[in-house]
């Protein structure tokens, strides 16, 4: 008897779950670091409740941090599922957390894309609001400017681009994780069934008892 899950043996399926969980954990940590760097180097200077663009920057950064934490949690649950595969509550936990992770990462990616577009549209004026000089065409390191204005524009776009790539990757692997959890939950609603067989028995030759055995006999003489 050969047990198969989604065309893979149980051992191979556990390995796929383990690798997917590890990738989610790594992506979540890197995305969290990128969001923390963005807040520490840029957004802590431009947080202004009366500025809609700066407020949108901060909301997207908070969303990025939240998404990274959810991704890490989802990756850990996938790794645990690879060890305790028969647990039904754990399967549902992985499935629900993976779906939430995919939606949150996709929302985060759209928010980061909007931040990049608004930065290009406004030429980074919201990033330079803490400085007193007139505009980005007069960039100079002034004593009353809390950061280097010559680098904040490129640094922000670079960190936003990195975070955007990682959010897209997180959503892809979260969908993959949800697909794997969907397979072990044995849900096939489009077939009109709540469960399907994932155990396939290898065919074995069986002798028919009603089939007479033919033995060689000598010639009959009358």
UniProtKB/Swiss-Prot annotation:
> Could you tell me where this protein is found in the cell?
Membrane
Q: Does the keyword Repeat apply?
A: no
The record's region (Disordered) falls at: 198-222
| GO cellular component terms attached to this protein's record | membrane
> What's the protein name?
Transmembrane protein 54
What start-end ranges are recorded for coiled-coil regions in this protein? none
What InterPro entries does its record include? Answer: Beta-casein-like
Q: What is its main location?
A: membrane
């Amino acid at each position: 008897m050969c047990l198969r899950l989604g065309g893979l043996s149980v051992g191979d399926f556990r390995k796929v779950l383990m690798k997917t969980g590890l990738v989610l954990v790594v992506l979540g940590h890197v995305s969290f670091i990128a969001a923390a760097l963005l807040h520490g180097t840029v957004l802590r200077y431009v947080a202004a409740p009366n500025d809609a663009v700066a407020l949108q920057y901060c909301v997207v950064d908070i969303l990025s941090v939240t998404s990274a934490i959810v991704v890490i949690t989802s990756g850990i649950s996938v790794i645990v599922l690879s060890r305790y595969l028969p647990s039904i509550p754990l399967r549902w936990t992985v499935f629900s957390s993976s779906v939430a992770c995919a939606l949150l990462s996709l929302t985060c990616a759209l928010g980061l894309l909007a931040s990049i577009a608004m930065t290009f549209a406004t030429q980074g004026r919201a990033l330079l609001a803490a400085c007193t000089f007139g505009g980005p065409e007069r960039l100079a390191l002034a004593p009353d400017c809390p950061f280097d204005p010559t680098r904040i524009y490129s640094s922000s776009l670079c960190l936003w681009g990195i975070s955007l790539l990682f959010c897209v990757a997180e959503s892809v692997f979260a969908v993959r994780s949800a697909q794997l959890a969907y397979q072990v939950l044995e849900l096939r609603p489009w077939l009109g069934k709540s469960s399907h067989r994932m155990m396939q028995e290898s065919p074995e030759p069986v002798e028919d008892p009603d089939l007479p055995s033919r033995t060689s006999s000598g010639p009959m003489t009358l």
